[in-house]
Every structure is written in C-alpha cells, then in structure tokens.
Amino acid sequence: VKAVIEETGFSKATLTKYVTLLNDRAMDSGLELTIHLEDENLRLSIGAATKGRDIRSLFLENAVKYQILVYLLYHQQFLAHQLAQELMISEATLGRHLSSLNQILSEFDLSIQNGRWRGPEHQIRYFYFCFFRKVWSSQEWEGHMQKPERKQEIATLEEICGASLSSGQKLDLILWAHISQQRLRVNACQFQVIEEK
C-alpha cells in the first residue's frame, strides 16, 4: 500500500475509495476481478476468463487523458471550458492533463493544441489503432463485431483475398474501420472545404 500511495500521491482514504470503486465497477460489468486491501497489502484476484484489455479498460475508463482522447475521436475539436465542464474538472486541471498527454503524444509526432489534433492524419489513426488495440474491452470488441457493416467488410475482404481471416485479423480490421470511419466523419467539413477550393 505504501508504494502505491507514494506512486500515485493518493492518501490511504482516497486509495481505499478507488479500490472500492474499481471493485464495484468490475462487478457491475461482470468482470472477474477483485482488488483486496488487506492490512498494508494490495492483492489482485482475476478470473481465468478475464483478459488484460478488460483490466486496462476498467482502470482507464474514468481517466481524464483517456476521456480526452475518446472525445477527440468522436468530435473534431473541443473548447476547453466546455470539455472541462463535461469531465467535471477545472480548466487548470484540463490544461495539466493536456500538457502531460502532449508529452506522450510527441512520440507519435502528434499534439493537441487549441482543442484540436495537430499532426499527420495517418499518424493520428495509427496512434488510435495502437491505443485502442490495447484498451478496448472484450465487450467493445464484441459490440463492433456484431455490426452488420463490419460483418460485410470482413466477408468482402475474405472474398477478395480468397482466404479466411483469423480472429485477430478480424479484430484489427474492425478497429481500423471504426477509427477511419470516425476520423472521416469528424473531418468531413475539412474535406468539404478542400473540395470547394
């Protein structure tokens, strides 16, 4: 417990609250995961069917940086005061999270400035692909797998290739198609401006 408190900067009371919250959320989502806080030790118990991506998703869902990235996938831009209000944080806190996030994004030659992505479109998509490949929960994967348009895309690609895709290849295709679809949708007005010129 001491090492976790030092690493996170949480008080023991805050850590206890987070452990309770995570356990409740795991139970609500049907995830076989429990964090035990016993004396001065933390212990993680996971079921055999629990996947790493489900654990990462559980921990990240309410993280501010994660929510910023998800917001920008589905929206072209944000105004700081509106996003801060939506995330229920101060603008100063949002600014600190954006600064920290930009340090991470610099590895991809990307940044978020004035509420918008800055960087090459292919890098933005590649970043989202690498990121969501690790953090999408099994439920999210399954939800996208069941969409008729995704099933059709898989069938079409298998027909063109003359081979069946593995489950991993199908998941990669579904993720890439989802990211591309969202990026095209949020950038539609930019493409319209280019077409008009």
Residues covered by each model-derived region:
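A cross-family "folded-core" feature that marks the main globular domain of proteins
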Residues: 1-197
